[in-house]
Amino acid sequence: ASVHEFLVK
């Protein structure tokens, strides 16, 4: 997973 996914999730 990417940093963006971490923030969205």
From Swiss-Prot:
Indicate where this protein resides in the cell: Secreted
Provide GO CC annotations from the record. Answer: extracellular region
What does the record say about tissue specificity?
Expressed by the venom gland.
Q: What is its main location?
A: secreted
Keywords tagged on the record: Mast cell degranulation, Secreted
Functionally, this protein is described as follows:
Mast cell degranulating peptide.
**Protein name (Swiss-Prot/TrEMBL):** Venom protein HR-3
